Swiss-Prot record:
Chief location: membrane
GO molecular function: ATP binding; ATP hydrolysis activity; ATPase-coupled phosphate ion transmembrane transporter activity
Protein name: Phosphate import ATP-binding protein PstB
Originating gene: pstB
Domain of life: Bacteria
Amino acid sequence: MQLNLRAEVKNLVFSYGDKKVLNGITLPIYENRVTALIGPSGCGKTTLLRCFNRMHDLYANAQYQGEILLYPNQSNILGKDIDPMEVRMRIGMVFQKPNPFPKSIYDNVAYGLTVRGVKKKSFIEEQVEKSLQQASLWNEVKDRLHSSATALSGGQQQRLCIARALATEPEILLLDEPTSALDPISTRHIEELIQELRKDVTIAIVTHSLHQAARVSDFTAFMYLGDLIEFGASDQIFTNPKDQRTENYITGRFG
């Protein structure tokens, strides 16, 4: 099966002031595939994920070197002439803890569209329904769209956050430990959802759960101390890693 690039990290160095966090990362992200970033706490995986949609720009001492190219036009989204807000519309993100806005379910999903200046009500309504359908939440909330989002269960709130990210039709969806605050049943729903979403959107996920990475991902990148140690097909990484450090991590010898 042919693999097409959706994004490519090239020689990415990232620092907070004088502290270097990423040491020249080069990594492909393939279209309509799930790429898992794994590694012990502090290895740089969440830092790398947040580079994709310029979240670090919110901090004054953040410094990027290198490129993140978005295909097919190979534009460098780290370029100084690129608007970070536009990047965040094209590359959505869902965080570790569900963070619905203190608004209605409808307004949460419509938020990105209204920020973008979309005014056509019928289009917004269509996108809200479509995104909630994609997030497997529509049937549970269709009769209470104008109820508060904070009244939803934790698992429903996380699916709402996924719907909110999907509403602007991002090219890539970033998931930062999306199930770590959820119960096992909600976790299973999110994992099943990831498998469905990959048909429509490219996904990169940070997870501390090696079992989850093996279950949901097509490719896995193992990071350690700011370096990318090994990248490959997930079945190869988890059954026949090439680097001893990868094997030590996935067999529980450290981390």
